[in-house]
């Protein structure tokens, strides 16, 4: 009787081992990044923000030349996110956050902060976007020598129109309109120097630029 039960017992043990084997397998180590994204202007938690990690790695003593995607996801209703990706030898790592109507953010992270299966925390503040539409108009009979020089000053952010360079417009070309994407809910200082037959004029002023809308700025001379 014992000899008949022995093969059955072996079969049952094999089945149990097959079932338990996957649960006993050691999980591959991962990096974990968590945080929350809020509006810089209001402090409100932002849902639906696309968050992603890019990395440059070292493998076989070879340094990867470009950033490659490592993980991506989006924030939930309370603005939080969690990203996981396989462990590699990190050389550089950065977090990207983007949402419609907000200025994208790129944050450089310290590779040495990342340890296998340990959480690294990084919160993000996104600036709401706005636009300013500038119109420079010579309302008189424009002379060739007429000149207006215009620039935004003291802008503490990257903006195609806000780098401090002068925009110079001569004579008949003075009817000009251009638009810039800027941070919302800020005061934006501007400077205009006008040289014309009707007289010279210096304008130094500021413009309030609400978030999510386009604010007009018209200078006539």
Give the label of every model feature segment.
Residues 86-115, 193-202:
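A short, solvent-exposed loop/turn motif at the edges and junctions
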Residues 42-63, 140-160:
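Short, ordered, surface-exposed loop/turn motifs in non-cytosolic proteins
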Residues 1-24:
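Sec-dependent bacterial lipoprotein signal peptides
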Residues 59-80, 158-174:
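Short, acidic Ser/Thr/Gly-rich low-complexity loop/linker segments typical of extracellular
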Residues 110-129, 133, 200-221:
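Extracellular beta-sheet/turn segments enriched in Thr/Pro/Gly and aliphatic residues
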Residues 20-32, 36-41, 118-129:
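Beta-strand-rich domain onsets/edges
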Residues 77-93, 168-191, 209, 219:
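Short Pro-Gly-centered beta-turn/loop motif in secreted/extracellular proteins
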Residues 33-39, 79, 132-139:
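A short, amphipathic beta-strand motif
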């Amino acid at each position: 009787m014992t000899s008949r039960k022995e093969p059955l017992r072996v079969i049952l043990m094999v089945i149990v081992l097959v079932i338990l084997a996957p649960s006993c397998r050691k999980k591959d180590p991962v990096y974990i990044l968590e945080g929350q994204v809020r509006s810089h202007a209001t402090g409100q938690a932002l849902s639906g923000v696309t968050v992603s990690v890019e990395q440059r790695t070292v493998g076989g003593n070879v340094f990867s030349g470009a950033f490659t995607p490592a993980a991506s996801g989006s924030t939930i209703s309370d603005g939080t996110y969690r990203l996981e990706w396989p462990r590699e030898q990190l050389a550089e790592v950065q977090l990207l956050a983007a949402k419609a109507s907000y200025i994208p953010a790129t944050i450089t992270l310290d590779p040495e902060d990342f340890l296998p299966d340990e959480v690294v925390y990084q919160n993000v503040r996104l600036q709401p976007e706005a636009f300013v539409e500038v119109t420079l108009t010579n309302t008189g009979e424009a002379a060739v020598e007429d000149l207006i020089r215009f620039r935004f000053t003291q802008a503490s952010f990257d903006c195609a129109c806000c780098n401090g360079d002068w925009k110079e417009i001569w004579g008949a070309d003075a009817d000009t309109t251009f638009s810039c994407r800027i941070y919302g809910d800020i005061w934006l200082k501007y400077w205009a120097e006008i040289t014309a037959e009707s007289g010279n004029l210096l304008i130094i002023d500021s413009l309030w630029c609400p978030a999510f809308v386009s604010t007009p700025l018209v200078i006539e001379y």
